[in-house]
């Protein structure tokens, strides 16, 4: 297939957290607000003259300094952010808005405040107290946290407009990006998709890490380009799979999987599109902030939720996504030492295979994908096993 017009430009943008578009927005007087978790509503960080940046630390090398401050037994994603912060890579930030969801990430982000890692006198760090259940009481608590620890500090420190009208405008702009990426994602359902998982991963990551008002036109143009794009006559993939798990902020992971012969047709991981790129529908009978809060709590698929309906809902979602996108198997991945996904992938991969009949493989990995020969071998073996199952099905065997 012909390369997408903006693919190379987007790839270059993802090489740095402080990329040229972030620099442009800051030069225009806008405030860069960093976050790392789905539970920090992205849309709230794009209200008024603010824009959201989901923190990444691309091209990270040694983690010696962050390991000194934390531990060798902490996931590399958390340590990479701290390492980059110590290097001075996040001095463009106006605030860091975090959630008490992952204790490892909390320890990493606390150091931004303790070590004064951002050279900005007005810079502040805030943590939301997150509930473990979704009830009317927990929604009220979540709304209160968002108001007291996000909206009010932004208004008091930077004079940000956090009125209901400003929130509605932010939701409308957020939904436009979501509609574009959702429509692009529909092409992944085709028998011979006209977009690869790597390309979609790039587009989605850019929407998380760059000011949306500076990329929405290019995303819209990319959608039009894809509508006209013809897929390769002979598919370059051998099987289609879903990837489920913890943070994948490195598109090199998706590239590695696809080079092994498995086309990634659906993603259910942090930094992915499910959840993350659904439109937010405001309930006219509820306050705007409560509608936003309910959206994020109810759509979250984080394994920190232990309600029975939430646990079973995560399994059923993966099953339904595989059916909808015609995925033949599921790759469950977990960052090494990830406290939540370490439990989730073990049980979920068993349930998906033995209860739902969908082949799966479970792997743990380092944050940096480059040169990971062991992971490549695991994926290749999984691809071959799926091909064997296909042949057996065609021959009527088991």
Q: Which residues make up each language-model segment?
A:
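Glycine/threonine-rich flexible loop motifs
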Residues: 104-108, 338-344
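A short, acidic, amphipathic alpha-helical segment used as a generic capping/interface helix at domain edges
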Residues: 85, 309-326, 344-347
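Proline-aspartate-enriched helix->loop->beta-strand connector
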Residues: 94, 322, 326-331
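An N-terminal, globular interaction/scaffold subdomain
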Residues: 34-89, 93-95, 100, 108-109
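Redox- and metal-dependent alpha/beta enzyme cores, enriched for Fe-S-associated oxidoreductases
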Residues: 27, 38-56, 245-310, 314-319
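A charged, amphipathic alpha-helical module
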Residues: 1-31, 143, 151-279, 307, ...
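Acidic/His-rich segments in extracytoplasmic proteins that coordinate ligands and/or metal ions
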Residues: 80-153
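Peripheral docking tails and interdomain loops at the edges
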Residues: 3, 346-398
């Amino acid at each position: 297939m012909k390369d997408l017009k903006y693919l190379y430009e987007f790839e270059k943008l993802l090489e740095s957290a402080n990329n040229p578009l972030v620099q442009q927005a800051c030069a225009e007087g806008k405030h860069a607000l960093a976050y790392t978790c789905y539970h920090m509503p992205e849309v709230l960080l794009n209200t008024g003259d603010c824009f959201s940046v989901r923190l990444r630390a691309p091209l990270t090398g040694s983690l010696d300094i962050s390991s000194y401050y934390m531990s060798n037994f902490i996931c590399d994603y958390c340590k990479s952010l701290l390492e980059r912060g110590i290097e001075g890579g996040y001095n463009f930030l106006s605030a860091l808005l975090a959630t008490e969801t992952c204790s490892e990430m909390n320890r990493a982000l606390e150091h931004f405040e303790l070590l004064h890692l951002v050279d900005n006198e007005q810079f502040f760090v805030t943590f939301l107290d997150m509930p473990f259940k979704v009830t009317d009481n927990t929604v009220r608590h979540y709304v209160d946290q968002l108001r007291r620890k996000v909206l009010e500090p932004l208004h008091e420190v930077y004079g940000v407009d956090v009125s209901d009208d400003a929130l509605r405008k932010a939701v409308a702009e957020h939904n436009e990006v979501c509609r574009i990426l959702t429509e692009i994602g529909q092409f992944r359902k085709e028998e011979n998709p006209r977009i690869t998982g790597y390309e979609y991963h790039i587009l989605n990551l850019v929407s998380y890490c760059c000011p949306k008002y500076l990329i929405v036109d290019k995303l819209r143009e990319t959608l039009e380009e894809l509508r006209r794009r013809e897929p390769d006559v002979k598919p370059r993939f051998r099987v289609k799979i879903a990837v489920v798990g913890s943070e994948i902020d490195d598109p090199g992971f998706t590239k590695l999987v696809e080079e092994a012969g498995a086309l990634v047709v659906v993603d259910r991981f942090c930094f992915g599109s499910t959840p993350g790129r659904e439109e937010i529908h405001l309930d006219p009978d509820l306050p705007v902030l409560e509608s936003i809060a309910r959206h994020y709590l109810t759509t979250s698929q984080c394994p920190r939720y232990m309600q029975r309906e939430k646990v079973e809902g995560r399994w059923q979602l993966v099953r339904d996504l595989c059916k909808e996108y015609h995925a033949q198997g599921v790759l469950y991945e977990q960052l090494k030492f990830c406290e939540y996904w370490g439990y989730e992938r073990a049980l979920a991969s068993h349930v998906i295979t033995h209860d739902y009949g969908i082949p799966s493989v479970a792997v743990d990995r380092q944050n940096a994908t480059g040169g990971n020969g062991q992971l490549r071998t695991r994926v290749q073996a999984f691809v071959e096993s799926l091909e064997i199952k296909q042949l057996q099905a065609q021959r009527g065997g088991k």
